[in-house]
Design a protein with these regions (language model features):
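Serine-hydrolase catalytic machinery in alpha/beta-hydrolase-like enzymes
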Residues: 26-126, 226-240
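C-terminal catalytic histidine-bearing segment of alpha/beta-hydrolase fold enzymes
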Residues: 39, 205, 210-266
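Short alpha-helix in the alpha/beta-hydrolase fold that links the catalytic acid
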Residues: 69, 193-203
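Gly/Ala-rich beta-loop-alpha elbow adjacent to hydrolase catalytic centers
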Residues: 138-142, 146
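Short beta-strand/loop motif that positions the catalytic acidic residue
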Residues: 177, 183-185
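Acidic catalytic loop of the alpha/beta-hydrolase fold
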Residues: 188-192, 221
Length: 266
């Protein structure tokens, strides 16, 4: 029954994508003198302005996975920008390099915000975007970043974190968070243990944030990435694993979340 449901969702998405005229465009922009290389996607057949969504990449860097998610958002009727948080489009091809690149940005929130906000400006300037309706989604490292930007008080309608770590050195303060928050995490993700989830909930409650946390039982880290199992085997990281059910359900939750925060039907 579940396989049948997943197939129906996939077919519906494929049909919608076929009707859309999704365009993709590489863009270069700057933050603090560093060249950043992003990717914009939008439905060229759609008339009028629409919400804009930033896509923040995994710890591997701005790659095809982030671009594919941007195109998927465009097919839903949004204009999406897959940003570059590392600079010059740098990508990591080994976990050691990915960890260092991620740490350099994660541990410097001033730098992270500078590069994130540069992406917001690019997105807002696109002629298809209603610059008052901006959200952000992030995967793994990207999930960390969107939550940190929400904690910093960025003026976003909402953020969605997919299998991102929830710990922070700068907890949200009451009245500071403007964005609504959606956290989608795996119940078998050792990088986001149950105690971390509970700590995050306490943080959000204390700061009076409008948030929701959904845990997918049995889902490992990177459960949305179809290459997760291959990467896990390649680098002997048992924590990685794709989960088709959690992938489909979390994407559907994000769509419902966007309908709510943008107050319009998609």
């Amino acid at each position: 029954m579940m396989k049948h449901w997943i197939l129906l969702v996939a077919l519906a998405f494929a049909a919608h994508t076929a009707q859309a005229a999704v365009k993709g465009e590489e863009v270069q922009y700057q933050a603090g003198g560093t060249v950043l290389k992003g990717y914009l996607a939008w439905d060229d057949a759609q008339k009028g302005k629409r919400p804009g969504v930033l896509v923040i990449h995994e710890w591997w860097g701005h790659n095809e996975y982030a671009r594919e998610r941007a195109r998927m958002l465009a097919a839903l009727g949004y204009t999406a920008l897959a940003v570059d948080m590392y600079g010059d489009g740098k990508q990591a091809h080994h976990p050691d390099d990915a960890g260092k690149m991620m740490g350099d940005v994660r541990n410097d929130l001033v730098l992270a915000k500078q590069r994130f906000d540069a992406g917001v400006r690019v997105l807002k300037k696109h002629p298809t975007v209603n610059n008052k309706d901006i959200a952000a989604i992030g995967y793994c490292f990207g999930g960390i970043i969107v939550l940190e930007m929400a904690r910093q008080g960025d003026n976003l309608k909402g953020v969605a974190s997919f299998h991102g770590n929830l710990a922070t050195k700068q907890p949200a303060r009451p009245g500071q968070v403007k964005a609504r928050v959606l956290v989608l995490t795996g119940g078998a993700d050792p990088f986001v243990p149950a105690e971390q989830v509970e700590g995050f909930k306490k943080e959000m409650d204390a700061a009076k944030v409008n948030y929701r946390v959904i845990v997918y039982p049995g889902a490992k880290h990177s459960f949305t990435n179809k290459d997760a199992d291959k990467l896990g085997q390649q680098f002997n990281i048992q924590a990685f694993g794709y989960n088709a059910e959690a992938d489909q359900k979390s994407w559907a939750e994000m769509q419902n979340f966007f309908k709510e925060i943008f107050a319009q039907k998609k």
